[in-house]
Amino acid sequence: GSKSYWKVWWDRDVGDEKASVINVDDMNSQKTEDLDEVHIYKKIRSELGILPVRLVYSPEGMEIEKYELNTDLQKAMLLYKYKEQTVKYTMYMNNADSSFGEKETDKLTDEFLIISDNGVEIKVKEYEEKDKKVKRYEAEFEYAGAQYEIKGVVEKEEFEKILKNLYFSK
């Protein structure tokens, strides 16, 4: 994978806060010019054994930019671009170590639940980003033995629409 991309992305995402950085040495990283999400989801299923929950709805202009699979950590990360921001979708097996760099410097302004059509509880947290007057949303849920996280600066209505339209593979 391109470490320079990660360094830039990580610095931008975390700022000067101390964060535990994900080891990207053994991740297969792909730029996704000609890759479609269906192909990525199939790869996640075959290589990681995760039944991927698919993003069926995405706001206009939100496009997948890059994805990474780490078979050692049993983890997949899809990065989307949306209005000059990055939306990060991560999935990993429950037994996998989820040592994400958590930044708790933003102010938690709201927490709520969204229940998907098949009864999965999705916990959502709304943060106000320091220095920027924007809201960032983080959603977490569990399905078929895996953990899922979707994080990004997206309008609340759009974020809820993404979550309400998730497709849960059987």
Task: List each model region and its residues.
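Surface-exposed amphipathic alpha-helical segments
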Residues: 144-170
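Membrane-interface helical sensory segment of bacterial ECF anti-sigma factor regulators
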Residues: 1-13
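Short, solvent-exposed recognition patches
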Residues: 17-142
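Charged/polar, solvent-exposed surface patches and flexible loops
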Residues: 7, 43-46, 161-164
